[in-house]
């Protein structure tokens, strides 16, 4: 089905202004998923924050209980010894210090996540212009600067997603694949939303989780009725 036809098909199934129970929203997306690859299911969450204010920017990470369905390549900056061994044992594809930095500067950047121990940031700091634009710069707010690199690697590989508000105060995140069953997708979304609630800025006023919409990779969004998510 051509993309324009798919978009029209989803649009035709969605009543403007209506919110849908999570299961119904996912059903609409799955019945319209016709791409030649397994599409991701994404979520957009509009938060009740003023993203222009530094104290109302929301940034963090969540380990999705059902994973993301993606294979994740991880590089770790850690000094030789116990921390480096811990990262390798957890499955990191590359571990090092200056030697790893030199490889990255030479073009070896085929990684989805870069993690660093605090004492390795002196090396990583020199790679800011290289890693920053690619979204790979380690940051303690999202758990990629950690004194426990083994745990950080396990989180990254087991379904950790990172998020931050855009200029409109919206969080965009993947919660799995269209091939996931509904319960897996629901548990992932619940975990994300609960973590977002925990990250609510103290200065945020009014309704915090203003709107939750799900979409497939190639399709428009469907607004979810939050009461169907049983958030506690």
UniProtKB/Swiss-Prot annotation:
Lineage: superkingdom: Bacteria
CDD domains in the record: Ribosomal_L1
Pfam families, per the entry: Ribosomal_L1
GO molecular function: rRNA binding; structural constituent of ribosome; tRNA binding
UniProt keyword annotation of Membrane present: no
GO terms for cellular component: cytosolic large ribosomal subunit
Keywords: Repressor, Ribonucleoprotein, Ribosomal protein, RNA-binding, rRNA-binding, Translation regulation, tRNA-binding
UniProt keyword annotation of Transmembrane present: no
Family per record: Belongs to the universal ribosomal protein uL1 family.
Complexes and interactors: Part of the 50S ribosomal subunit.
Chain's role: Binds directly to 23S rRNA. The L1 stalk is quite mobile in the ribosome, and is involved in E site tRNA release.
Name this protein carries in UniProt: Large ribosomal subunit protein uL1
Organism listed in the record: Xanthomonas campestris pv. campestris (strain ATCC 33913 / DSM 3586 / NCPPB 528 / LMG 568 / P 25)
């Amino acid at each position: 089905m051509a993309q324009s036809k798919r978009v029209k098909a989803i649009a035709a199934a969605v009543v403007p202004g209506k919110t849908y129970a999570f299961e119904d929203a996912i059903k609409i997306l799955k019945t319209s998923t016709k791409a030649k690859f397994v599409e991701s299911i994404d979520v957009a969450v509009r938060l009740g924050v003023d993203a222009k204010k530094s104290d109302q920017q929301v940034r963090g990470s969540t380990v999705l209980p059902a994973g993301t369905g993606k294979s994740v390549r991880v590089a770790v900056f850690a000094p030789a010894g116990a921390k480096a061994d811990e990262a390798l044992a957890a499955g990191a594809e590359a571990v090092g210090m200056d030697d790893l930095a030199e490889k990255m500067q030479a073009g070896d950047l085929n990684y989805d996540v870069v993690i660093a121990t605090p004492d390795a940031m002196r090396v990583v700091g020199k790679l800011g212009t290289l890693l920053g634009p690619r979204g790979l710069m380690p940051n303690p707010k999202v758990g990629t600067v950690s004194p426990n690199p083994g745990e950080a690697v396990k989180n990254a590989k087991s379904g950790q997603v990172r998020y931050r508000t855009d200029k409109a105060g919206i969080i965009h995140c993947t919660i799995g694949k269209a091939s996931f069953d509904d319960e897996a997708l629901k548990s992932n979304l619940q975990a994300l939303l609960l973590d977002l609630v925990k990250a609510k800025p103290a200065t945020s006023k009014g309704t915090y989780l203003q709107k939750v919409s799900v979409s497939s990779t190639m399709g428009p969004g469907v607004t979810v009725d939050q009461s169907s998510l049983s958030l506690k």
